[in-house]
């Protein structure tokens, strides 16, 4: 339980995405590929067929693990709860690695990130990216915002890294009003256009061709936790060296099941 709590603290995606539990095998998630429409029909007229078409997204499981060895003396003499610290440290390690994969993972031996060319978010800027390779304008953030369909904007938020935050905090509209609005309540995120802003070190910096800001409803990113997450203490394996090992393992996958629900801003190449 301590490991799970630490993971949620360290990985922002676990707070924003849809987290499910799976037992075995791949999980098939049905997704609407195209939607039908209604039609105006004459009295006694034939109602035209207009079916939705469906596709599937398959979510599996990839193994993520970490280990640490501690001397028996340190474990016995420690003035604080060392096992509690180790659980939190494992949460930091695994949580950071998860977050990295959920953003830039290529789907090979790890989850598929929202920035991956295949199965990732859609481009919310022009085909050539922003007007500059080294900056972002007020209008480009506005374009990104409105590139996302209205139903998704209701639960949408921005994610970027700290250096991009620094640049965007300086943007003003034509009347001198800042685009960025700081939070007035402790524990709640700042906002852009009334949408929360979160930061991640794994979002690329502002540079030519980089995807630097992502905006969308991340509940359409599904994280599948395979049952069997473990946190083990190994008393015997390193006994000859006077050490105790601690191992944490988990199996997890993540995929964006509806790409149109998340958009990214890309710098000019």
Model regions: which residues?
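C-terminal amphipathic alpha-helical segment
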Residues: 153-163
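Hydrophobic, well-ordered secondary-structure elements that form the walls
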Residues: 161, 197, 246
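Extended, compositionally biased alpha-helical segments that mediate assembly or anchoring
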Residues: 235-269
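C-terminal hydrophobic structural anchor segments
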Residues: 191-236
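Short active-site-adjacent structural elements
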Residues: 168, 206-208, 222-224, 240, ...
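Short intrinsically disordered coil segments
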Residues: 43-48, 82-85, 174-175, 212-214, ...
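Acidic/polar, low-complexity extended loops/arms that serve as protein-protein interfaces
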Residues: 1-155, 169, 177-180, 184-191, ...
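A short pocket-lining beta-strand/turn micro-motif at the edge of beta-sheets
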Residues: 154, 193, 227, 242-244
């Amino acid at each position: 339980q301590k490991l799970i709590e630490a993971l949620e603290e360290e990985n922002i995606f676990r707070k924003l995405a849809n987290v499910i539990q799976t037992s075995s095998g791949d999980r098939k998630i049905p997704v609407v590929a195209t939607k039908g429409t209604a039609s105006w029909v004459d009295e006694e007229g034939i109602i035209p067929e207009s079916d939705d078409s469906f596709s599937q997204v398959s979510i599996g499981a990839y193994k993520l693990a970490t280990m640490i060895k501690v001397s028996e003396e340190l474990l016995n003499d420690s003035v604080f709860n060392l096992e509690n610290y180790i659980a939190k440290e494992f949460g930091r390690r695994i949580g950071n690695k998860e977050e990295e994969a959920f953003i830039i993972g290529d789907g090979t031996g790890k989850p598929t990130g929202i920035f991956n060319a295949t199965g990732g978010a859609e481009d919310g800027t022009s085909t050539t990216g922003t007007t500059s390779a080294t900056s972002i304008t007020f209008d480009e953030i506005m374009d990104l915002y409105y590139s996302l369909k209205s139903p998704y904007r209701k639960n949408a938020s921005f994610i970027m890294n700290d250096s991009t935050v620094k640049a965007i905090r300086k943007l003003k509209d034509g009347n001198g009003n800042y685009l960025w609005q700081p939070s007035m309540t402790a524990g709640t995120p700042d906002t852009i256009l009334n949408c929360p802003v979160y930061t991640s070190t794994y979002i690329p910096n502002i540079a030519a061709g980089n995807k630097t800001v992502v905006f969308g409803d991340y509940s359409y990113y599904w994280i599948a936790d395979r049952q069997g997450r473990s946190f083990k203490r190994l008393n015997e394996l390193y006994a000859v060296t006077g050490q105790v090992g601690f191992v944490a393992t988990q199996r997890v996958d993540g995929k964006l099941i509806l790409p149109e629900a998340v958009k990214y801003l890309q710098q000019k190449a």
